Amino acid sequence: MTTLLNPYFGEFGGMYVPQILMPALRQLEEAFVSAQKDPEFQAQFNDLLKNYAGRPTALTKCQNITAGTNTTLYLKREDLLHGGAHKTNQVLGQALLAKRMGKTEIIAETGAGQHGVASALASALLGLKCRIYMGAKDVERQSPNVFRMRLMGAEVIPVHSGSATLKDACNEALRDWSGSYETAHYMLGTAAGPHPYPTIVREFQRMIGEETKAQILEREGRLPDAVIACVGGGSNAIGMFADFINETNVGLIGVEPGGHGIETGEHGAPLKHGRVGIYFGMKAPMMQTEDGQIEESYSISAGLDFPSVGPQHAYLNSTGRADYVSITDDEALEAFKTLCLHEGIIPALESSHALAHALKMMRENPDKEQLLVVNLSGRGDKDIFTVHDILKARGEI
């Protein structure tokens, strides 16, 4: 099939979907390309970002956790966005695209519930019906977000098949869309899946990096030495990286979830520790068993618990333009506690992975002068029960 935009990033990406979905993907690509050139669409999107979501978000300089080092650390505060995370940015864009295509329903999948909440709020705002597939395990883990979605009129459908987590919710959402794409838009929640989703999601998240660049130049008079973001599917990271890719002096660091430790096999780091395969409509690195079945991913944070990764991250890794590392549950939890105690900010467990790597860079080279920006992709209100239970079990509270 000929496409308007390149469906690949190097060898990664593509459109590995049933033939029945090809017209829906083609229609979506056409709508996106025309919307990008339409000043009216852009004005509407920018108005929602500013006056509904609360952009631009702040760039906060850490006051205390860098004490005794030569590191200057800033946090890009996506946690301050309406809805509580970066997810709100791109769902507003996709919801406007859905309206542009004449769709009346939204289908979405969610892990931590953040994308579900974002999809529900965008649907409520723009008068779209919304149904959200969520792994039954995640429904239990993330009850506050489930209730938020239902408050905003979304139907939440628990998925009991397979591991009852995000990958199963993705499969069910795609199955639904196969039979309903004439009236429904599939609101994919990350920069992964079949073309054109990775490109659409990047473009609807790229204001994160654009704002960061302008803000850091204003505050410090120079670009950062590195920008750091957590990577599950990779939308907050690609949103931060996109505007810095051509700034070759700026390091791009993506942080995958190391779970209980890479050596245990219980992690969510397919980019560095998986094999390339085809899953979820794309060719990308993924966690696979010996015989090629998709393996369970694991992370303390439901939003990073994804067995594959967006194709552009795979490409940036293969070319060496970005570095990808992993952080364990315990390291992320320590970073979570550190930010709460010393800066008065409760970060999402997802974002705590990126923060943990920045703290590691700082501790390993305390005398090194470095200017770092962490994408604080979401707030941790949704995680306080998880953290409470862990700290209680350890006797720390």
UniProtKB/Swiss-Prot annotation:
What protein name is recorded for this chain?
A: Tryptophan synthase beta chain
Q: How does it assemble?
A: Tetramer of two alpha and two beta chains.
For this record, the Gene Ontology CC terms, alphabetical, are:
cytoplasm; cytosol
Coiled coil (residue ranges):
none
Entry similarity comment: Belongs to the TrpB family.
Pathway per its UniProt entry is: Amino-acid biosynthesis; L-tryptophan biosynthesis; L-tryptophan from chorismate: step 5/5
Q: Which organism is it from?
A: Escherichia coli (strain K12)
What is its biological role?
The beta subunit is responsible for the synthesis of L-tryptophan from indole and L-serine.
- UniProt-listed GO biological process terms: aromatic amino acid family biosynthetic process; L-tryptophan biosynthetic process
Q: What class of enzyme is it?
A: lyase
Determine the domain of life of the protein's source: Bacteria
Catalysed reactions listed for this entry:
(1S,2R)-1-C-(indol-3-yl)glycerol 3-phosphate + L-serine = D-glyceraldehyde 3-phosphate + L-tryptophan + H2O
Q: Which keywords annotate this record? A: Amino-acid biosynthesis, Aromatic amino acid biosynthesis, Lyase, Pyridoxal phosphate, Tryptophan biosynthesis
User: Upper taxonomic classification of the species?
Assistant: Bacteria, Pseudomonadati, Pseudomonadota, Gammaproteobacteria, Enterobacterales
Cofactor requirements of the protein: pyridoxal 5'-phosphate
| Acetylation is among the record's keywords | no
E.C. number(s) listed in UniProt: 4.2.1.20
Substituting residue 281 to R results in: In mutant TRPB8
Q: InterPro entries from the xrefs? A: Trp_synth_b_CS, Trp_synth_beta, Trp_synth_beta/beta-like, TrpB-like_PALP, TrpB-like_PALP_sf
Show the active-site residues: 62 (nucleophile), 86 (proton donor)
What's a single GO MF annotation on this record?
tryptophan synthase activity
Give the N6-(pyridoxal phosphate)lysine positions (modified residues): 87
